Amino acid sequence: MKNIILFLFLVFNSIVLYPQSKKNIDKESIKSMCGCYEVKFEFAETFTYSEDSTYVKSPPKTLYALELAHLIKEDKNDISIQHILQIGDYGEPYIIKHWRQDWSYQNQDFYLYDSNNFWKYKNRSKSEVKGQWSQKVYQVDDGPRYEGSGTWVHVDGKSYWESTTPAPLPRREKDIRSDYNLTLRGNRVEIMDYGWAHIQDNSKIIRKNNINKTIAKEKGYNTYKKVED
């Protein structure tokens, strides 16, 4: 009888404590993105599906920057990180506000980009977002950029989070492209030994009358290498 009681006690504790310990590991992974980083942004179109014979690919793009990611909010279910960018010549650098990422645990309320500057509200069920974290990204002007939800995975020495979500054209494309109106962003945030990486597998889409047509694929690989503050 004592063995049965002990077994039930251990099972109960594992059921209750595991989600909390997993959640805490998730939170530490998110907060590990804070700090000062040398950043390298790389983007390139990988595949073209356009039927237009005059189609011109976007040129590959590589940028470097120094960025500070500062924790500005943390509570039981929310973490907010503001990114500050240093740009300009080394002799005369200047600081600008950059993007912000807000993480929420088991968030059910989403504003998802449709196309042509139109957003749609979507409520997801508790079962859909169980154990997940949503990442909402804001632009320099605090306007919404995109929002997606996924599960943090900690396995084989890796910690990563993945989500696919619709978004407007990125800033690097907005001024040079008008032949598509939606980006489907495949985001992977992975914690690395040097810092972290934001890996993207994006689709460039024409959305018309709720029908999507993919004209190109794009790969993004952004590395954040930690340096002294």
Located regions from the model:
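Bacterial Sec-dependent N-terminal signal peptides
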Residues: M1-K22
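N-terminal helix-cap/turn-to-beta initiation motif at the start of protein domains
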Residues: S21-C36
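Short, solvent-exposed loop/hinge segments that bridge or flank secondary-structure elements
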Residues: K22-D26, E42-K76
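Low-complexity, serine/threonine/proline-enriched polar segments
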Residues: K73-H154
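Acidic, serine/threonine-rich low-complexity disordered tracts
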Residues: N181-R188, D193, A197-D229
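Short helix-loop boundary/capping segments
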Residues: K126-L184, K204
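Hydrophobic/aromatic beta-strand elements that line small-molecule binding cavities or substrate pockets
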Residues: V56-P59, L63-K73, Q82-I84, R100-D102, ...
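Generic short beta-strand segments
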Residues: E38-F47, I84-Q86, T164-R172, I199-I206
